From Swiss-Prot:
Name of protein: Intrinsic membrane protein PufX
Principal subcellular localisation of the protein: membrane
Example of a GO cellular component annotation carried by this entry: plasma membrane
Function of the protein: Associated with the reaction center - light-harvesting complex I. May play a critical role in facilitating the interaction between this complex and other components required for light-driven cyclic electron transfer.
InterPro entries assigned: Intrinsic_membrane_PufX (IPR020169)
Top-level taxonomic group: Bacteria
Annotated GO biological process: photosynthesis
Family according to the record: Belongs to the PufX family.
Species this chain originates from: Cereibacter sphaeroides (strain ATCC 17023 / DSM 158 / JCM 6121 / CCUG 31486 / LMG 2827 / NBRC 12203 / NCIMB 8253 / ATH 2.4.1.)
Key words of the record: Cell membrane, Membrane, Photosynthesis
Annotated localization: Cell membrane
Amino acid sequence: MADKTIFNDHLNTNPKTNLRLWVAFQMMKGAGWAGGVFFGTLLLIGFFRVVGRMLPIQENQAPAPNITGALETGIELIKHLV
């Protein structure tokens, strides 16, 4: 009976042991996926930080946005129509 262990008798294991092994495998598989997603996200954030630091520092040369520009355009359109 001493030669009967889980390692050399894996085909005739107890159903309870099979369930425990399956649950443990599923948990390890889920932990692997979670770790992969977590570290993948960290790598992506790090990549964007490196690319952002390589870009030149320049001020925006465009003029400030005109918030009332749409209203002025609408008023001019109404004046042309009337």
